């Protein structure tokens, strides 16, 4: 790490990686931004294209294509590399294929002398974040997955649309696996400072069955998008940007990242999407919500599925 200069290395210049890269340059988040890909020509082309956008950015960024050696001085390495989810394929279906890819990537990065923070986006993200932690040997606080940041954003957007409220004033979380077993924390959902359950009780036009449908659309959003355009990338690109800003700016912001549990929520030895305080050190602490009995059971099931899926590849 260079004093006073933030360096971010992106590994993987597919649609997700490039959406994140464009967001980073667009907002001028880091002084140095390096693109790494097994397809070196692709990384070079993307770096050239992005560098031409720098004059329009709010602050200058040095952009180049590089190698794992550039990770030595990096504050943050973001990994989006891996095989994408195909139509009809679940995130967990990808586990064996992408675990093999990830082990090679992480070893290459660590061989550079990297001692910063990992941010993982490749699916199945909770499992691959765990794999990264194990392979890297870094402290658990400095290995983070995108978790349910995107799911929570989708949730806030759809609830805001339903209630005709700015989604930035919707405070609601999706937790658990980033995938089919995720769950909404209805018991802590608020609009501004008012509980969602209170709004529901006092307004006949709002119905629980509508909210349940909203959650289903959140959970299945990736399937719907993949069916129509082949992949999702804008939303996750912005999600990664948000986590990056929280880290580099030492924000102490609460985001639903994939973080390591060691007793919180009654679970341990798993990376799962939960609210956590994010700053320059990575995960400062996990915010433990008081879940109701139904939410507790669903969360425990989500963790169980992740562990069962992960066991054969570790």
Swiss-Prot record:
Location(s) in or outside the cell: Cytoplasm
Please provide the Gene Ontology terms (biological process) for this protein: glycolytic process; lactate metabolic process
The active site is formed by 178 (proton acceptor)
Enzyme class, one word?
Answer: oxidoreductase
Question: Which branch of life, at top level?
Answer: Bacteria
Cross-referenced InterPro entries, in alphabetical order?
L-lactate/malate_DH, L-lactate_DH, L-lactate_DH_AS, Lactate/malate_DH_C, Lactate/malate_DH_N, Lactate_DH/Glyco_Ohase_4_C, NAD(P)-bd_dom_sf
Kindly list the positions annotated as binding NAD(+). Answer: 16, 37, 42, 68, 82-83, 121-123, 146
Give GO terms: molecular function aspect only: L-lactate dehydrogenase activity
Pathway given in the UniProt record: Fermentation; pyruvate fermentation to lactate; (S)-lactate from pyruvate: step 1/1
Q: How is its activity regulated?
A: Allosterically activated by fructose 1,6-bisphosphate (FBP).
Q: What does this protein do?
A: Catalyzes the conversion of lactate to pyruvate.
Identify this protein by name. L-lactate dehydrogenase 2
Q: Name its species.
A: Bacillus cereus (strain ATCC 10987 / NRS 248)
Query: Which lineage?
Result: Bacteria, Bacillati, Bacillota, Bacilli, Bacillales
What gene does this protein come from? ldh2
């Amino acid at each position: 790490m260079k004093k006073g200069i933030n360096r971010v290395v992106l590994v993987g210049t597919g649609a997700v990686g490039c959406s994140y890269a464009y967001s980073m340059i667009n907002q001028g988040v880091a002084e140095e931004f390096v693109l790494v890909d097994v397809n070196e020509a692709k990384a070079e082309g993307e770096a050239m294209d992005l560098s031409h956008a720098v004059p329009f950015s709010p602050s200058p960024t040095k952009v180049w294509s590089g190698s794992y050696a550039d990770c030595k001085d990096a504050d943050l390495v973001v990994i989006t590399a891996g095989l994408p989810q195909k139509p009809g394929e679940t995130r967990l279906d990808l586990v064996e294929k992408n675990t093999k890819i990830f082990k090679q990537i992480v070893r290459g990065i660590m061989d550079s002398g990297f001692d910063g923070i990992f941010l993982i986006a490749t699916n199945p993200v909770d499992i691959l974040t765990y794999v990264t932690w194990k392979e890297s040997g870094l402290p658990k606080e400095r290995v983070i997955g995108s978790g349910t940041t995107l799911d929570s954003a989708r949730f806030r957007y759809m609830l805001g649309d339903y209630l005709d409220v700015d989604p930035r004033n919707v405070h609601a979380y999706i937790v658990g696996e980033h995938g089919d077993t995720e769950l909404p924390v209805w018991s802590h959902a608020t609009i501004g400072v008012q509980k969602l359950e209170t709004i529901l009780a006092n307004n006949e036009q709002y119905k629980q069955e509508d909210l349940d449908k909203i959650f289903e659309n959140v959970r299945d959003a990736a399937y719907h998008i993949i069916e129509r355009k082949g992949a999702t990338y804008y939303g996750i690109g912005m999600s990664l940007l948000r986590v990056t800003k929280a880290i580099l700016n030492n924000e102490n912001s609460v985001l639903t990242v994939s973080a390591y549990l060691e007793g919180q929520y009654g679970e341990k030895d798993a990376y799962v999407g939960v609210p956590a305080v994010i700053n320059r050190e990575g995960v400062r602490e996990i915010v433990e919500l008081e879940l109701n009995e139904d939410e507790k059971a669903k969360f425990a099931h989500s963790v169980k599925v992740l562990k069962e899926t992960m066991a054969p590849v570790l």
